[in-house]
Amino acid sequence: MTAKDSFIRTADEEHARTMKLLRAYPTDKLELKPHDMLKNARDLAWVFALERYLGTRIWNDELTKGAPGKPPAAPQNWNELLSGVDKAHQDFMGLVRKASDDDLKKKVHFFVGPKQLGEMSRMDVLWFLLHDQIHHRGQFSIYLRMSGAKVPSIYGPTADEPWM
């Protein structure tokens, strides 16, 4: 299995896990905001789409041309938001699926510190974005618990889905 194939398999598996978590969220709690410094649940869920939006701009090395542009706003309708997250993933992964090994080795500009750009390979950026998705999914699982919903199994059992 190539590094590209491994990434695609892992990214698609993680996307399915993320969608499982998002689908478990109660639509009457989208404005839940656990702290003033945090996003509400709707906006945090939309981060999964925004990461793919940003990923496309990074893929095209647009960060050297200034801010990546105003990202699309989160849909108010939860099902539209879920569809948007799924579409963003599929569109972004389309770039990856078409990429050659040389495309993945190409250096692009990405944040390496506060207000600081550095060069990274596209493959390294892909893994960074995937890890960031997993991080935000962990945050979202806390929102799910705080909303009173059941937290589904992601990698193993949860209090709501014991395996034994």
Language-model features: locations:
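Acidic catalytic patch
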Residues: 98-113
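Active-site rim elements
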Residues: 3-8, 75-82, 126, 130
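Short, solvent-exposed, charged loop/turn and helix-capping segments
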Residues: 25-28, 101
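Helix-adjacent hinge/juxtasegments
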Residues: 57-101
